[in-house]
Amino acid sequence: MNIRMVLLASAAAFAASTPVLAADAIVAAEPEPVEYVRVCDAYGTGYFYIPGTETCLKIEGYIRFQVNVGEDVGGDSDWDAVTRGQVQFTAKSDTEYGPLTGVIVMQFNADNATDQDAILDSAYLDVAGFRAGLFYSWWDDGLSGETDDIGSVVTLHNSIRYQYESGTFYAGLSVDELEDGVYQGTVDPVTGVFTADDGPNNVGVAFGVGGTAGAFSYQVTGGWDVDNEDGAIRAMGTVDIGPGTLGLAGVYSSGPNSYYSSAEWAVAAEYAIKATDKLKITPAVQYYGNYFGGGTEVPEDYDGLGDAWKVGLTVDYQIVDNFYAKASVQYLDPDDGDDSTTGYFRLQRSF
């Protein structure tokens, strides 16, 4: 009897304590409200706000597969397949000086499973017309086809520049670091060893002026290589005529330098035919006076060099939106060397 009473008393005590235990139970916290990604349409399509900030970000890039063709282009082989992936991040935000822009471009290249590289293709900041960082110069611009050879050997520099823009017109000036540019020097006739006249190039000054006027677009670009004490100037323009666009360009170099070293002068022409909404065919031609051929080790002048001419054809086809195919073939015939035929076939998916 006593045992029964003890058990009943214990059960009653346990039942009485149950509300206290319930009050002490762990309660799950309310979930924080989620801030979904918001579209930013202030700077064009593709931008979104970085959550918690007023900075707009755009992510774009492409995947490219390409087969190059030419004599020994792949070492002992006359063809070589390569693949590239590129991603670009562009950040923009409003300031009292106008939009503040930052760009980072990463590029990944693969010749095969073991021969690969990852490079910083561009990284710069831009505000109120001023730009500083690693970016391509105006000398990287060219005609739309693949035949013209009117640019620098190296067009990607650590630079600082100012560019004024007003509607369809722009004009700018840049100071470029040229330490990976062109070196003037001499070649020993016995050993064939090249000896540079000076150390690494350290600075160059370039300008660019361009714009559009109706169906006509134009650009004038110049550059002075301080170490080599030579410069170059180039003019090019395009105009819509008939079913396509005519492009013309001319360049002059006072001596081999980091802005232009292929020849003392050259002229180029192309006609980009828009055959259909998806197909473009571009035949082109270029003539060089006192042709050297480019490279980073160059003579002190162009004296005694022969001329050269080049013809080519480029075909662009849009398979579907953001998916393109391109084929190009080029023939070069220099007076002082062997002629050559090169080309490539490319597939590219952009996003």
Language model segments and positions:
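Detector for outer-membrane/organellar transmembrane beta-barrel domains
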Residues: P200-K310
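Hydrophobic, lipid-facing positions within transmembrane beta-strands of outer-membrane proteins
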Residues: T83-V87, D121-A123, A128, L156-I160, ...
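Outer-membrane beta-barrel "beta-signal"
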Residues: R4, T18-L21, V239, Y317-I319, ...
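Transmembrane beta-barrel strands of outer-membrane/channel proteins
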Residues: I63-V67, I104-F108, A132-Y136, L173-E177, ...
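N-terminal periplasmic/intermembrane-space "pro-region" immediately following the signal or transit peptide
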Residues: M1-E60
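Outer membrane beta-barrel
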Residues: G46-G181, G208-T212
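Repeated loop/turn-to-beta-strand initiation elements of outer-membrane beta-barrel proteins
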Residues: E96-P99, G129-A132, T168-L173, A213-V220, ...
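Gram-negative outer-membrane beta-barrel proteins
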Residues: V67-V73, T95, A110-T114, W138-G142, ...
